[in-house]
């Protein structure tokens, strides 16, 4: 895994697991709102009334509706940041 994912993946996973409403701003200025349903290396699935697949290269900013706490490295050792532990 590249260094670019060391912050991105835990952040998106926390937003997904805690079902935090997010606003996603695209590079063209469009604002999308919903909850992160899933994500991979290239896309984010955003669920609102419908699911939208948004390519990460089109995303400028992800703004959560409330503050989120990222898991610390010690949490990861205990498996708290694994996707299956929701």
Swiss-Prot record:
NCBIfam families in the cross-refs: Hfq, PRK00395.1
Family per record: Belongs to the Hfq family.
Alphabetical list of InterPro entries matching this protein: Hfq, LSM_dom_sf, Sm
Domain Sm: 9-68
Region of interest: Disordered: 66-86
One GO cellular component, as annotated: cytosol
Phosphoprotein keyword on record: no
A single BP term in Gene Ontology: regulation of translation, ncRNA-mediated
Subunit structure: Homohexamer.
UniProt keyword terms in alphabetical order: RNA-binding, Stress response
Protein name: RNA-binding protein Hfq
Basic and acidic residues bias: start-end ranges: 75-86
Coiled coil: none
PANTHER family: RNA-BINDING PROTEIN HFQ
Disulfide bond recorded as keyword: no
Role played: RNA chaperone that binds small regulatory RNA (sRNAs) and mRNAs to facilitate mRNA translational regulation in response to envelope stress, environmental stress and changes in metabolite concentrations. Also binds with high specificity to tRNAs.
Name of the coding gene: hfq
GO MF terms held by the record: RNA binding
């Amino acid at each position: 895994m590249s260094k670019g994912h060391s912050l991105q993946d835990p952040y998106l996973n926390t937003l997904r697991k805690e079902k935090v409403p997010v606003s996603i701003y695209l590079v063209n200025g469009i604002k999308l709102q919903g909850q992160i349903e899933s994500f991979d290396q290239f896309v984010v699935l955003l669920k609102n009334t419908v699911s939208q697949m948004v390519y990460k290269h089109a995303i400028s900013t992800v703004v959560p509706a409330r503050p989120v706490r990222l898991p610390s490295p010690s949490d990861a050792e205990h498996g708290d940041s694994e996707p299956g532990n929701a």
